[in-house]
């Protein structure tokens, strides 16, 4: 079990450290320092404790030379580091006590830390959970990503609209990162490739010339295992110019030219997912991807060579690159380039090594999210990489033709380069030795639908790894009241073995345990109500049902279905003032991509509906609607702990897995959802009676998509109550100043638009089923004991959904890693 730091943690030493950090960082005594300065001083003191373990970990890896996974991801949504590090050091209470003695409040200090703006949604949070589990399970790993200056954006809600402002999370510095200038690498863009024959070897040689380049400089952030000595590194790359400043140009008055290289570097790391509605944005995204991938692969190869006498031929025995979605797929061609152009390997040998080294996780069923690049852009920006991809494609197309003679349809679907585009998912599948989906249903859909041709040709590559979450952050840190109660009941083994929660099943019928559990939920609701009052100025009743949907805003996630139902419910109450219902607080939180128009309109709709409902005294507070601004990991932790109902209402077959569903479940909420993604497995664990399922099945959705037969207009014409709700989108009820404000939403539900079907995501089709499920939730909540038993069962059955289980499966079945305990 976890080794507490208590034995070698000196409270006095720690206090001294904090005081001296304040002096050396700010020339201030602790009493004079402001909250942000105190946060920095405390963080440096905690980092001091981490450093020895961090050094020991890397010494251990040098000594044992274990196989290492490089987890490559565009996003790492880490959340705040201070509290998480204190928990994984098993020193939270000791440090809190030391700070108390200095007259400092740990909660105030933790609140000073901005969330690291390195990700946006589930993809990035999964990567963060995986890093936590890898270190806790003592597996050697690097996370590889980009050190974004502003991340995605900070969301502000102004007059109901989402406004994107830069998220300047680094403005006060990140106390936990360490710059590693000694591992800098050049990354080249553009130019052309000159080839010549080497007379000595008779080989064709390729040299990129006339290119522009930037220098990638890594910053390492410690990722601590819980209760052990392992500290792995999240390595995020910053871009610096090759030549900082051109004095010559400056002196000649060409100020633009003087800082040109600086700007090239700066742009690459400015933001996550620059808007790719335009050519420049597309180019910048591809630059970002190649930038961090090239630097990471160069470093991994160099590290391997330094430990293996300069030889690269067995690198696959010690290195594996896991591609988290399609963004890092250029790693395939970059590894080929390094093996051939820099290490003199022939094609066949390089390809053999590459295909034993790279593995791919597919995260989406949505075709538009499988990246494709115009040949013109790809070949101009990455000329040598494009040549290599072209050759991979040529050889693979020959394989297809040999296996399926005369079948041009197979070529069309499977070729890496086709129709003027480079298809990154196809490259990842062809080169990867493993292709995994992230929930059982998702993997089955990939095999039978989206990637069927690949599955038929290379079935041995495909496997499923259902996602998970780290209980250290999402229960132990996010919900200390519940965490302590669980430990009191079953011991603290669950912190590193979540399957132990099953022991709580002994208590689900115990009236006293039920009362305690619901009292904890109530206190967490009071905490969230306070947050809402402070941030939204809205009073919400902790005795109401907290019905929550927090996640990225996308049409398939159907925040629209949720708010249309709220409008419907409001109509019911207005028609019948004595309408009998348990008061309900509908809580939303979501960022919409800056260029995603209808998603942003949905946010405006939610806020306008909230404005009308929250200010209507006649409904006596039966409904409140809250949109939480700038949803992120840190406020997510407060939200998950307080939810009664977890809205997981994506159109069946569209959500690969989802992980928010697991966070709510772990904290004792009931899933109101479709049979989609990991919801299917949640229902398998808790039993259908402990969830509230509605809507079309995945098979039904796919059938409608393939064969047609659904007309939303029919529902509109025949269902008066649904028609009333839709008419309110265009009659000014929620936008008196502009009746056309929500016309696009109305049209998307009822009118075909070019190639797009009306109601693409079956909102009206599922509406009645959803409304009925919501009515049942109301009914169930009134049965106090039945409800308590259901939500306690959800917590007790959450064991499967730990990222520790997921990582154990990746490590043993895909990566073939060996646990490497760190001795100190």
Task: Give the location of each predicted region.
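A conserved ligand/cofactor-binding region detector
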Residues: 1-824
């Amino acid at each position: 079990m976890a080794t507490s730091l208590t034995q070698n943690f000196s409270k006095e030493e720690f206090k001294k450290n904090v005081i001296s950090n304040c002096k050396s960082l700010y020339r201030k005594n602790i009493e004079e320092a402001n909250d942000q300065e105190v946060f920095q001083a405390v963080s440096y003191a905690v980092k001091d404790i981490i450093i020895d373990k961090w050094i020991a970990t890397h010494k251990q890896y040098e000594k044992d030379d274990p196989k290492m996974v490089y987890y490559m991801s565009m996003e790492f949504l880490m959340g705040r580091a201070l509290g998480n590090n204190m928990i994984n050091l098993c020193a939270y209470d000791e440090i809190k006590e030391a700070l108390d003695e200095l007259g400092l409040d740990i909660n105030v200090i933790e609140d000073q830390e901005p969330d690291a703006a390195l990700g946006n949604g589930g993809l990035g949070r999964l990567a963060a959970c995986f890093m936590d589990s890898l270190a806790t399970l003592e597996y050697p790993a690097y996370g590889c990503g980009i050190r974004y200056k502003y991340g995605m954006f900070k969301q502000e809600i102004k007059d109901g609209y989402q406004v994107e402002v830069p998220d300047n999370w680094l403005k006060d510095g990140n106390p936990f990162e360490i710059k590693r200038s000694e591992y800098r690498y050049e990354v080249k863009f553009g130019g052309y490739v000159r080839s010549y024959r080497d007379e000595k070897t008779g080989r064709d040689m390729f040299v990129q010339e006339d290119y522009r380049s930037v220098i990638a400089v890594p910053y390492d952030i410690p990722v601590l295992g819980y209760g052990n000595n392992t500290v792995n590194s999240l390595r995020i790359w910053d871009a610096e110019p090759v030549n900082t400043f051109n004095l010559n140009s400056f002196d000649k008055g060409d100020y633009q030219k003087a800082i040109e290289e600086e700007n090239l570097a700066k742009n690459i790391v400015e933001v996550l997912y620059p808007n790719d509605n335009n050519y420049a944005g597309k180019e910048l995204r591809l630059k970002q991807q190649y930038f961090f991938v090239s630097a990471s692969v160069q470093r991994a190869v160099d590290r391997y060579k330094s430990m293996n006498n300069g030889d690269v031929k067995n690198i696959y025995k010690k290195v594996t690159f896991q591609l988290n979605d399609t963004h890092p797929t250029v790693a395939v061609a970059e590894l080929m380039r390094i093996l051939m152009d820099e290490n003199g390997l022939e094609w066949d040998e390089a390809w053999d090594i590459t295909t034993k080294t790279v593995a791919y996780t597919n995260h989406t069923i949505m075709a538009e999210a499988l990246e494709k690049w115009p040949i013109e852009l790809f070949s101009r920006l990455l000329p040598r990489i494009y040549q290599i991809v072209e050759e991979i494609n040529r050889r693979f197309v020959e394989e297809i033709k040999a296996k399926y003679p005369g079948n041009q349809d197979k070529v069309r679907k499977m070729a890496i380069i086709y129709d003027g585009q480079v298809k990154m998912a196809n490259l990842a599948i062809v080169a990867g030795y493993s292709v995994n989906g992230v929930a059982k249903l998702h993997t089955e859909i990939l095999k039978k639908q989206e990637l069927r041709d690949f599955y038929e040709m290379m079935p041995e590559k495909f496997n499923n790894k259902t996602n998970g979450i780290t209980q250290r952050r999402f229960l132990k840190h996010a919900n200390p009241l519940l965490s302590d109660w669980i430990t009191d009941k079953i011991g603290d083994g669950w912190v590193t073995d979540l399957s132990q929660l099953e022991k709580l099943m002994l208590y689900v019928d115990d009236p006293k345990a039920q009362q305690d559990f619901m009292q904890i939920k109530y206190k967490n609701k009071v905490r969230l109500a306070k947050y809402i009052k402070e941030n939204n100025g809205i009073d919400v009743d902790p005795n109401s049902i907290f019905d929550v949907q927090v996640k990225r805003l996308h049409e398939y996630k159907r925040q629209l279905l949720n708010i249309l139902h709220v409008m419907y419910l409001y109509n019911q109450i207005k028609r019948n003032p004595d309408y009998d219902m348990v008061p309900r607080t509908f809580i939303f939180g979501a960022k919409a991509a800056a260029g995603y128009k209808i998603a942003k309109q949905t946010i405006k709709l939610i806020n306008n509906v909230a404005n009308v409902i929250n200010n209507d005294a006649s409904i006596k507070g039966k409904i409140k609607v809250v949109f939480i601004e700038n949803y992120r990991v840190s406020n997510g932790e407060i939200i998950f702990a307080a939810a009664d109902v977890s809205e997981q209402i994506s159109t069946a077959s569209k959500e690969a897995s989802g992980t928010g569903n697991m966070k709510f479940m772990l904290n004792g909420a009931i899933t109101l959802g479709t049979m989609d993604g990991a919801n299917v497995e949640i229902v398998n664990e808790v039993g259908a009676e402990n969830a509230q399922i509605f809507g079309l099945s995945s098979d039904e959705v796919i059938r409608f998509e393939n064969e047609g037969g659904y007309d939303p207009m029919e529902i509109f014409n025949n269902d008066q109550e649904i028609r009333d709700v839709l008419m309110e989108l265009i009659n000014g009820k929620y936008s008196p100043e502009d009746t056309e404000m929500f016309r696009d939403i109305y049209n998307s539900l009822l009118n075909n638009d070019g190639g797009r079907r009306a109601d693409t995501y079956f909102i009206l089709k599922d509406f009645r089923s959803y409304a009925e499920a919501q009515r049942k939730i109301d009914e169930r909540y009134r049965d106090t004991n039945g409800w308590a038993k259901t939500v306690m069962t959800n917590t007790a059955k959450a064991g499967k959904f730990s990222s520790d289980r997921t990582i154990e499966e990746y490590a043993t079945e895909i990566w073939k890693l060996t646990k490497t305990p760190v001795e100190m």
